[in-house]
Structures are given as C-alpha cells and as structure tokens.
Amino acid sequence: SLSHEKYYALGSGPARAMAAKIKDGNEEPVEELYKELGYRDSFDSTVLVIENDAVPPPAIVEKVAAACKVDPGKLTVIVTPTSSLAGGLQVVARVLEVAMHKAHALHFPLENIVDGFGSAPLCPPHPNFVKA
C-alpha cells in the first residue's frame, strides 16, 4: 500500500516488482513476496496503477520512483477509482493473481504451476467505491 499524510491507496503493476529498500545494509524487494520468490524487475521506466480517486501527492511519486531506481519522469502513474469502469476492470483482472497468492499462502510449489487462466464478472460502475 501507498500512504502519505491523509492519502492512502493500493498499487499494482510493474513498479511493484522493481521497488527495493535497504534493510540491514542490504538491498531487497519492498514486497516480501518478491523476496521469497527471488524475483525483481529492472528497467529505466515503469508503471504503477493506483486504486484511488485522487492523484497521489508528489512525495509518493518521488518515493516510488526512488524505490524503482527510475527518474520520476519515467514513472507513469495510472489512477483508477474503484467506482469507475477502469477501476472495476483493474480489480477483476487480478483474479488469477489472487489465485496465485492463495496457492503461495497454502505453500503449494509455485514452480509447478505452468499456466493459468481466470475469469470473473465485470460489474457496472457504482458511484460508491465500497459498493463498486
């Protein structure tokens, strides 16, 4: 999650696999899952999709860019309110990701998963983000 003062949002996209932090003098992925998987992306630009109805403050953009080791101008931030069609699609599109997280939580060997497919209904947008 991303937070700064009163701003809070969930983020997804390639930036999650690039973000790193220094812990005990060593660089490691920000997200524990990527540390466990031994996976990290590296590129000169990246994208972060944010579930929120407001543009993130500059402090968050700068923090994410620094964690991904990219210039802030090379970080594309896509804001998708959950109450919008794009926001609803972004949530539904993660159905396979949720299944993979569940398999991981159950200690199923992820290297045994060769392919995956998921489907889920796309509900119409709703002005109330909780109901959406």
UniProtKB/Swiss-Prot annotation:
**Keyword Membrane part of the UniProt annotation:** no
Q: Name one Pfam family in it.
A: MCH
Provide the GO MF annotations for this entry. Answer: methenyltetrahydromethanopterin cyclohydrolase activity
**Where in the cell does this protein reside?**
Cytoplasm
**Alphabetized UniProt keyword annotations:** Cytoplasm, Hydrolase, One-carbon metabolism
Hydrolase found in the keyword field: yes
Task: Identify the EC number(s).
Answer: 3.5.4.27
Q: Which reaction does it catalyse?
A: 5,10-methenyl-5,6,7,8-tetrahydromethanopterin + H2O = N(5)-formyl-5,6,7,8-tetrahydromethanopterin + H(+)
Classify the main location.
cytoplasm
Looking at the UniProt record for this protein, which Gene Ontology cellular component terms does it annotate, in alphabetical order?
cytoplasm
Q: Where does this protein act, in terms of pathway?
A: One-carbon metabolism; formaldehyde degradation; formate from formaldehyde (H(4)MPT route): step 3/5
Instruction: For this entry, list what GO says about its biological process.
Output: formaldehyde catabolic process; one-carbon metabolic process
The cross-references to InterPro entries, in alphabetical order and at most eight, read: METHMP_CycHdrlase
Q: Which family does it belong to?
A: Belongs to the MCH family.
Describe the task this protein carries out: Catalyzes the hydrolysis of methenyl-H(4)MPT(+) to 5-formyl-H(4)MPT.
Name by which UniProt lists this protein = Methenyltetrahydromethanopterin cyclohydrolase
Upper taxonomic lineage: Bacteria, Pseudomonadati, Pseudomonadota, Gammaproteobacteria, Methylococcales
Q: Which gene encodes it?
A: mch
